[in-house]
Regions:
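Noncatalytic alpha-helical scaffold of FAD-dependent oxidoreductases
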Residues: 1-259, 264-428
């Protein structure tokens, strides 16, 4: 593990940890290393699933580690949520943002070698469905790194802060980790949309707000009919989405072309034809509901499945207040949606897992804390550790097992028998 600082082990180097339990620094000596004469910054954009793209991290690191003349100076990762938050401008001519970006710095005293290595890195990305762009000048290289410097933008939509917990994952398991985080995100997203359905069901069960004046008078019978149709729509969509959430590991059967459902999961037909009992017929490639949602073969969409249908149902000036109220409900509930965003110091497997939260929303904070617990378990289940560059502090203490804490307590007795170094820290 690249940045595992458990028991002072940092890639084999003895070290101190962030909690301030190891001693008092009275002096320090800094060693400056000469920067190699030539460098390249490579930006890699991946538009497929993160699971398929993530092995490129290991392949690029292995290639650079084995190169006799080129050093890997930086390897950073941003996921789709970060790219959206920073307003990432896609370098590829494609019309969509990538699902994953890698930013790589390589350096060498041999200009030819560093240029060839940059091209080889792009080829490695191409083999994983990625596209690559190479910056040579100092100005262009700096521009490539600007998006990485704006990662705090992930919390811009909340009024408070982000929970930022780091873990260390074995590089070969990064794909499994990103899949695990995506599953958490899908569950949180669907749960938030079910909350919206419940709010809409309550709204349509009550008298509806109508715009009535000298120019507009709503027909009571027509209003009652539309109200019943809206209630049925919300109930059907809620049932469909709840089925997804309850059956993420079940086989998913996409609709046949004859059924009229789109491959992208648009419209109600695609979702309604999801099969929980089989893999879609003889010869079909098994696909789980989770994988279909992750790869956007099917979507859970407020805009397409509810909002668009409601706008088609409530056509007319007299119904504008109804549609405005639905949009307000959506906006209010969306503010409380919890999601997890990732960026990594990918070269050493140090993953920063960020969850933006509103400090005045207790339920949101509880949901975020539950997500953190799942993330810590995911990391350790994959052979990783929770003691990365952020250390343990206070928030991770509950996730350390008794044996680990007992080992630290024994160490502390030896180096600090009088408890002068941050007394009581990391002690239960």
């Amino acid at each position: 593990l690249g940045k595992d600082v458990t028991d002072k082990f940092l890639a084999g180097l003895p070290g101190i940890q962030k909690e301030g339990c190891d001693g008092l620094i009275t002096s320090a000596r800094f060693i400056l290393h000469r920067l190699p004469a030539h460098g390249r910054t490579v930006c890699l954009e991946f538009f497929g699933s993160a699971r398929e793209a993530t092995p490129a991290i290991v392949e690029i690191k292995d290639y650079c580690d084995a190169h006799p003349d080129v050093l890997l100076a930086g390897l950073e990762h941003l996921d789709a949520r970060y790219l959206k938050a920073v307003g990432y401008a896609t370098k590829s001519p494609r019309a969509t943002r990538p699902n994953m970006v890698l930013l790589i710095d390589i350096v060498s005293d041999d200009e030819t070698a560093v240029g060839v290595a940059a091209s080889k890195i792009v080829q490695l990305a191409n083999a994983r469905g990625g596209e690559g762009f190479i910056a040579v000048s100092a100005e262009t290289r700096k521009k490539f790194w600007l998006d990485r410097a704006r990662t705090a933008a992930i919390a811009a939509h909340t009024n408070a802060f982000k929970i930022n917990e780091d873990v260390v994952i074995p590089l070969p398991r990064l794909g499994d980790y990103t899949d695990g985080i995506e599953r958490i995100n899908i569950e949180l997203s669907i749960a938030n949309k079910l909350k919206l359905c419940d709010a809409l069901a309550g709204f349509f069960a009550a008298p509806l707000p109508l715009l009535e004046d000298d120019d507009t008078v709503a027909d009571p019978a027509q209003v009652a009919e539309k109200q019943a149709q809206a209630q049925a729509l919300v109930a059907a969509v809620r049932e469909r989405w709840a089925n997804y959430l309850a059956n993420l590991d079940a086989p998913f059967a996409p609709p046949s072309p004859a059924s009229g459902g789109g491959a992208g999961g648009e419209g109600r037909d695609t979702v309604a034809r999801a099969s929980w009992g089989g893999a879609g017929g003889e010869g079909a490639v098994p696909l789980t509901v989770f994988a279909a949602l992750r790869d956007k073969q099917v979507r859970v969409s407020w805009k397409r499945e509810l909002r668009r249908e409601l706008h088609q149902l409530f056509v007319g000036r007299e119904y504008t207040r109804i549609l405005e109220a639905c949009d307000r409900l959506h906006g209010e509930i969306l503010k409380s949606r919890v999601f997890v965003a990732l960026h990594m110091h990918a070269g050493d497997g140090n993953v920063h897992t960020n969850i933006p939260v509103n400090s005045d929303d207790y339920a949101m904070l509880q949901t975020a804390n539950a997500a953190v617990a799942r993330i810590m378990k995911l990391a350790t289940d994959l052979g990783g550790v929770i003691s990365g560059e952020h250390g343990i502090g206070l928030t991770k203490l509950e996730f350390l097992d008794d044996a680990t804490l007992a080992s630290f307590a024994e160490y502390k007795k030896k180096v600090d028998p009088h408890g002068r170094f941050n007394k009581g820290k990391l002690m239960r």
